[in-house]
From Swiss-Prot:
Its main location: nucleus. This is Protein mono-ADP-ribosyltransferase PARP3. One of its GO terms (biological process) is double-strand break repair. Changing residue 102 to L: Reduced activity on nicked DNA. It comes from the Eukaryota. CDD domains: parp_like, WGR_PARP3_like. It is found in: Nucleus; Chromosome; Cytoplasm, Cytoskeleton, Microtubule organizing center, Centrosome; Cytoplasm, Cytoskeleton, Microtubule organizing center, Centrosome, Centriole. GO terms for cellular component: centriole; centrosome; cytoplasm; nucleolus; site of double-strand break. Pfam families: PARP, PARP_reg, WGR. Mono-ADP-ribosyltransferase that mediates mono-ADP-ribosylation of target proteins and plays a key role in the response to DNA damage. Mediates mono-ADP-ribosylation of glutamate, aspartate or lysine residues on target proteins. In contrast to PARP1 and PARP2, it is not able to mediate poly-ADP-ribosylation. Involved in DNA repair by mediating mono-ADP-ribosylation of a limited number of acceptor proteins involved in chromatin architecture and in DNA metabolism, such as histone H2B, XRCC5 and XRCC6.
Length: 526
C-alpha cells in the first residue's frame, strides 16, 4: 500500500471555464470535431531555426534568412522509400549559404553546405533545389500540391515554450528582471502528477512508441494543419478499405501518402501498408493522441500576464485543466474500495495514488441524465499522453467506425480489460479513469455489432455481455451526489447465461458524452 500522505488543500476551479451545454444537444463525433478544429485553427508563422546538424548552427550571428527553410518528406512503400530532405538559406557574417541534409527518416543522413557570393545566388540555389525535389515553386508554396514521386512539404509551427524572464527597458541599456515565482500550492504527489501529464519527455516517448518521427514533428511544433491532412489521408484509406475487391496497390499508394504527411520512423524496415480495419483504427487513435498532445502543448503556450510575481509553473499548468484533483488518503474508505476493485479485477498492477476528480461544468452536463437509475463505477484506460486533454475536455466519442460495439465511449467492469488500452511512460507508470456511467436500461448483446451509433429505441446504453463478470453478489453500493452507484468488489466468475458470448470480458457502451462523469484518476505501476 502507498505510504500515508496529506490531502491537498481544497481549491476552486478557475472562473470563466467552458460553459455547460444543454444535455439535449446532439454531441459531436470526436473525429469530425477534431478535424474541423484543426483545419480552422489559425495558421501560425514559425520562427525558423538552423538545423542542429549544420556547422553554422553554433555561430553567434548565424540565422535562417527570412523564411527560407523547409522540411520535405517522401514515403513510397513499394520502393521501400521513407526519406526526408531539409533545405535552408543561412545568413552569417554578411555572407549567405544553402544547407541541404537528406536521408532515411530517423537517421542523420548526408549533408552539403554551399557558400555563395550574393544573396540572389543563394536564393536561386534554394528555389532550384525546392523545385527539383517537389515540382512546386517556392513562391507558390502556400498552395503546395503534392506530385507523384516527389517530396511533400511538412508544415510545423512555433514552439510552445514560455519565457520566465521579464525584459525591462532601463535608462540607457536593456536589462532582464527575473520574476518572483510563488511557492507551489499543490501537495507533492499532485505536483508530480501535473509534471507528468505535461512532460515533454512523456509526450516524446508516446510519439516514439507510435513510430512517429519526433525529429520531423518536434514537441511544440506540431502543425494543426499537418495533423488535419493526416486525418484526411486516413479518410481516403477508409474508403479504399471498403471497396470490393480491395486493391493492394491503391492501399499502398494511400498508405505512402499518409506516412509522407505524418513522418514515421521504421528504421530500415519497409513501411507497412495500412491494409486492415484494425491498422486503420490504430492510426486514427494515433492521430487523436497527436491532436490531444497538441491540446496540452497549446494550453501551456497560453500567454502569461507580464507581472513581477507569477504563480508556480505547476500551479499554472494545474489551473489550465479547469479541474479539481483531490489526493485520497490511503486510509480512506474510498481508497480501500478502489484498491480492492483493482486487486479483484486487475492483473499484475500496483496502485500508486488515487485522486478524486471534479471537472468544471461536467456535473451540470451529467444532470441531464438524472432520470437514469442504473449506474456503475467503471474503468476507462487511455494513453498517459492524452490525460491532460481528457481532464480539460472530458471523455469523447472515439471514431471506431469498425469497433466491436460501434461508435461510443467504451468502459469495463474488469480493470484488466481497460488496462489493455493504457499507454505507459518509459517507467511503466500508467493512468486510468474510474467513471460514473449512467447506464439506465442496457441493451445486452453477445455478438459484435460494429454499426451501432446509439442504443436501440427503449434502451439507454449497450452492454457487451462477457463470459466472465465480477461476482455480482460482491457489488457494493455507494452514494455519489445523491445517486446510488454500484461498484464491483468481487473476483470475475463465469456467467452461465453468456457462456457462448463472443466477448470474454464485459464492455459497457454509451453514445452520449454527457452520460458519464469522471470520478477518480488512478495512477498504477504496470
Amino acid at each position: 500500500m502507498a505510504p500515508k500522505r496529506r490531502a491537498p488543500p481544497a481549491s476552486q476551479p478557475a472562473d470563466g471555464g467552458k460553459k455547460a451545454k444543454g444535455g439535449q444537444e446532439e454531441e459531436e463525433d470526436a473525429w469530425s470535431s477534431a478535424l474541423n478544429a484543426l483545419k480552422t485553427a489559425p495558421r501560425e508563422k514559425p520562427p525558423a531555426t538552423i538545423d542542429g546538424q549544420c556547422p553554422l548552427s553554433a555561430g553567434p550571428d548565424a540565422k535562417v534568412y527570412e523564411d527560407y527553410d523547409c522540411t520535405l518528406n517522401q514515403t513510397n512503400i513499394s520502393a521501400n522509400n521513407n526519406k526526408f530532405y531539409i533545405i535552408q538559406l543561412i545568413e552569417h557574417g554578411g555572407t549567405y549559404s544553402t544547407w541541404n541534409r537528406w536521408g532515411r527518416v530517423g537517421e542523420v543522413g548526408q549533408s552539403k553546405l554551399l557558400p555563395f557570393t550574393s544573396l540572389e545566388a543563394a536564393k536561386k540555389d534554394f528555389e532550384k533545389k525546392f523545385w527539383e525535389k517537389t515540382k512546386n515553386r517556392w513562391a507558390a508554396r502556400d498552395n503546395f500540391v503534392a506530385q507523384p514521386g516527389k517530396y511533400t512539404l511538412i508544415e510545423v509551427q512555433p514552439g510552445a515554450g514560455q519565457e520566465v524572464a521579464l525584459r525591462v527597458d532601463g535608462a540607457g541599456d536593456e536589462k532582464v528582471s527575473k520574476r518572483r515565482v510563488l511557492p507551489c500550492a499543490l501537495d507533492e504527489t499532485t505536483q508530480k502528477l501535473v509534471a507528468l501529464i505535461f512532460s515533454s519527455d512523456m509526450f516524446r516517448h508516446a510519439m516514439q512508441a507510435m513510430n512517429i518521427d519526433v525529429k520531423k514533428m518536434p514537441l511544440g511544433k506540431l502543425s494543426k494543419q499537418q495533423i488535419a491532412r493526416g486525418f484526411e489521408a486516413l479518410e481516403e484509406l477508409e474508403a479504399a478499405l471498403g471497396e470490393q475487391p480491395r486493391s493492394m496497390s491503391r492501399l499502398e499508394e494511400l498508405s505512402s501518402r499518409f506516412y509522407t504527411i505524418v513522418p514515421h520512423n521504421f528504421g530500415r524496415a519497409r513501411p507497412p501498408p495500412i491494409d486492415s480495419p484494425e491498422l486503420l483504427r490504430a492510426k486514427k487513435d494515433m492521430l487523436l493522441v497527436l491532436a490531444d498532445i497538441e491540446v496540452a502543448q497549446s494550453l501551456q503556450a497560453q500567454k502569461v500576464e507580464e507581472e513581477e510575481v507569477v504563480a508556480h509553473p505547476l500551479d499554472r499548468d494545474y489551473a489550465l485543466l479547469c479541474c479539481q484533483l483531490t489526493l485520497l488518503e490511503d486510509t480512506s474508505q474510498e481508497y480501500e474500495m478502489i484498491l480492492n476493485y483493482v486487486a479483484q479485477t486487475g492483473g499484475q498492477v500496483y496502485v500508486l495514488n488515487v485522486w478524486r476528480v471534479a471537472r468544471e461544468g461536467e456535473d451540470k452536463l451529467f444532470q441531464a441524465h438524472d432520470h437514469l437509475e442504473h449506474r456503475r463505477l467503471l474503468w476507462h484506460g487511455t494513453n498517459v499522453a492524452v490525460v491532460a486533454a481528457i481532464l480539460k475536455n472530458g471523455l469523447r466519442i472515439m471514431p471506431h467506425s469498425g469497433g466491436r460495439v460501434g461508435k461510443g465511449i467504451y468502459f469495463a467492469s474488469e480493470n484488466s480489460k481497460s488496462a489493455c488500452y493504457v499507454g505507459c511512460t518509459s517507467k511503466r507508470v500508467g493512468l486510468m479513469f474510474l467513471t460514473e456511467v449512467a447506464l439506465g436500461k442496457p441493451y445486452c448483446i453477445t455478438r459484435d455489432e460494429p454499426t451501432l451509433q446509439q442504443p436501440p429505441n427503449g434502451y439507454d446504453s449497450v452492454q457487451a455481455c462477457g463470459r466472465t463478470e465480477p461476482d455480482p453478489a460482491q457489488d457494493v453500493e455507494v452514494t455519489l451526489d445523491g445517486k446510488k452507484v454500484l461498484v464491483c468488489q468481487g473476483k470475475p466468475i463465469p456467467m452461465p447465461a453468456y457462456k457462448d458470448s463472443s466477448f470474454f470480458q464485459s464492455e459497457y457502451l454509451i453514445y452520449q458524452e454527457s452520460q458519464c462523469r469522471i470520478r477518480y484518476l488512478v495512477q498504477l505501476h504496470f
